[in-house]
Swiss-Prot record:
GO cellular component assignments: plasma membrane
Residue ranges of every copy of the HAMP domain listed in the record: 193-246
Membrane topology: Multi-pass membrane protein
TM helices/strands, residue ranges: 11-31, 172-192
The name this protein goes by in its record: Probable sensor protein PcoS
Cytoplasmic topological intervals: 1-10, 193-466
Residues covered by the Histidine kinase domain: 254-466
The species this protein was found in: Escherichia coli
Protein localization: Cell inner membrane
Xref: CDD domains: HAMP, HATPase_VanS-like, HisKA
Amino acid sequence: MRFKISLTTRLSLIFSAVMLTVWWLSSFILISTLNDYFDNQDRDFLTGKLQLTEEFLKTETFRNKTDIKSLSEKINDAMVGHNGLFISIKNMENEKIVELYAKNSVVPAVLLNKSGDILDYMIQTEENNTVYRSISRRVAVTPEQGKSKHVIITVATDTGYHTLLMDKLSTWLFWFNIGLVFISVFLGWLTTRIGLKPLREMTSLASSMTVHSLDQRLNPDLAPPEISETMQEFNNMFDRLEGAFRKLSDFSSDIAHELRTPVSNLMMQTQFALAKERDVSHYREILFANLEELKRLSRMTSDMLFLARSEHGLLRLDKHDVDLAAELNELRELFEPLADETGKTITVEGEGVVAGDSDMLRRAFSNLLSNAIKYSPDNTCTAIHLERDSDCVNVMITNTMSGQVPANLERLFDRFYRADSSRFYNTEGAGLGLSITRSIIHAHGGELSAEQQGREIVFKVRLLMD
């Protein structure tokens, strides 16, 4: 089984790693900066003492021990307050002329050896766990100041104080970084827990969601922007889920109602036939009545299977150019006898050719026209208007409603939907005609909608020409 790391742990580790990396880099920069600072400080200090000693050489002679002693006293006075400072003056034969250093100090080897090979550069040496920095310079003297024309001045200093300070600072930073590991992990965990609180709320809501609590929603306003969008989409998902569940509940209720009537009729007629012996004509009438109910059940089953295939994209369309005006005129002629009985008329205007399955489109428009005639008042006109657009053909079917116009016209296309409890729309059918019509139009890549214009209802069909 694959080991999974929680998001809280991941973010905590990432937070800790970033925080520690930044602090360790800061510590490294601090140490490097201090080292550079002490390095420059020592260089300036040694250079200053070197120049001071050079000035003394220009003003003093050292032909005898008295001169050398006087020079040593001047240089020694300049060393007051500078513990760890070493000054050496040698001739070119590496013979010592002056050598001054603090009491109880170990003379560094850099003063004992000839340093003429490295001039005017600060060098660093380590002896007996002590680090020394030194600068040597060759200085010209006048002939009367000695036998040699040049001498070598070497100035060195003990960096023990700096080294001790840096060691203490490094030790402190080391232990601080160790403690920072635990602090970073804790702060990372705490910050992540606070930041992921909206996600835990989403998880809690999802785990507590049941069919009886589909109306629960999250509040995106209380979440950060990065999560509020996700929470809003989460709420949208619940809206779709609630809508789908409501449709499923309505569908289950409606299909039970639709099946109950024919099944009850079949049972009553069968019980009536079995109640006593009857002649052949009575049995024939009962069988014909049962046959009508069975046909109704068969049509309902076929319609349900058609809708199921449509929803799963299994409808096979035999597409070719379809003259909508011709098809609608044929339907007009087909429905005219039914419309004439109540003084209703049907008109078709416009033209348009689309790519589609003529049988499927004929069925879709037949359902729309049938509903328009069935639910319009007597002596009214059902108008069909075709209008060509840039890449499509729009078909508008307008008729006057005989009753109250449904409040939510879009739900007319739902399965078994009734506009009100009195089953205003499609009362004689199974309530699947408009659902089938919508499925056919969508299968052709078109759109179907309904809108109210006063007492009239307009069904708009949009079909692509190609």
